């Protein structure tokens, strides 16, 4: 199956190459085909493009129909001959004259009528409900217009040739009307394709009227009826007339039926295949867009250009992506307010009040002389300074897999080991504290901050009420880190840690710290042995 491609697949590839209308292509055009232009294209250029395309499609479809009709009346049913058995003024005068007149007048009138129905889009304004209705009716009106011109031609030629020989009546009645139905069906499909940009603009104003949107099934059955059902009925009528008139030999009748059957089969297949191809295009566009969303491209948005269930599919995709964007925005805001780790934990588990005992390391950071800082600078400068200060804190805490639990004025409380567990939270906390102290000296020499590090058992969880709570940690290490931060403000390096936290760290991290004397911290009964880092950058003079 993979080695041999079907005829339909080969034809599909040809059309995809010509029109680039395929979801397999890396850059799927907004309207499904580059022939229809870009969404940002000016209305004037779009009008010219669509008018030229419609005229070309209408003329081409009619020329093909005329060629098939000529084939049917001359070769499929050769007797009586329209050349030998009819006057020359009719075959070489009236017929070509009407064909040229109808082709020129019909192409101009139908194209102009379609452009008039799209006047609202050309003027760049929102359509009224009636204008929206006329826009969606445009393909049907083009098809009906072709049926009228071909119907007049059928009546005229059948009458004129029938006056000469009544054997011409069934031939022209069937052949011309048969081709007219095929041409009308083809122009309907082509017009619907060409008007996609305007249909998209109309759909932005609201869904199409329900009676103009029969759906995929209704549209498919109508095309089948006009492209295959009616021609088959015509074949049956031709056979019935032949049974009555008996003006063909058995071989001539068989040849005629075979030719007409082949024409019906081929053109019916082509029409149904084009319909299926046009129907599949929006699905392919959605599929390509889904792949982009899977890659995380949530800015993906589709142009809704179909008035059937396929348009609902495109609209539903846009609603889905809008919901995903909103969800991602809320997730981002949630993570910024409570911390990425807390937000991720809240998504994984059902949030509830209470907590659990955890072994964590705590880093408390507070700016030295914050009161003087606030009174000596304009408020805007203070906010800018604080944002730069906290940016350093957040950057280093995130880099060491910690959590900035809260900002308290010009201070911050960071946790290592909750809510996400760490193999050795002391290592991460001590390394982050050293990095913050070093960066503050180098990047913000005008702003000094005391840093305290402690470790131990705490209760970590959601504290508050059911309507409003926040994730935090409660325990002795938090108080100890705050007291060490106060003490560090008056010490060289502005960074102190408890010996207990340093002792619990890895050998590599312990080598970066030196133990000092015991100090009784405010609010503590037992003295705490201090530790300070070695090799920190000294403050600039």
UniProtKB/Swiss-Prot annotation:
Question: What Gene Ontology biological process does one annotation of this record name?
Answer: cAMP biosynthetic process
UniProt-annotated location(s) = Cell membrane
Looking at the UniProt entry, the stretches that span the membrane are 57-77, 90-110, 144-164, 167-187, 221-241, 257-277
Alphabetical keyword list? Cell membrane, Membrane, Transmembrane, Transmembrane helix
Q: Which residues form the HAMP domain?
A: 278-329
| Membrane topology, record value | Multi-pass membrane protein
Identify one Gene Ontology CC term for this UniProt entry: plasma membrane
The GO molecular function terms of this record are: adenylate cyclase activity
Give the Pfam families listed for this entry. Answer: Guanylate_cyc (PF00211), HAMP (PF00672)
Q: Which SUPFAM superfamilies does UniProt cross-reference here?
A: HAMP domain-like, Nucleotide cyclase
- Annotated Guanylate cyclase domain ranges read 361-485
Family label: Belongs to the adenylyl cyclase class-3 family.
What protein does this entry describe?
Answer: Uncharacterized protein Rv1318c
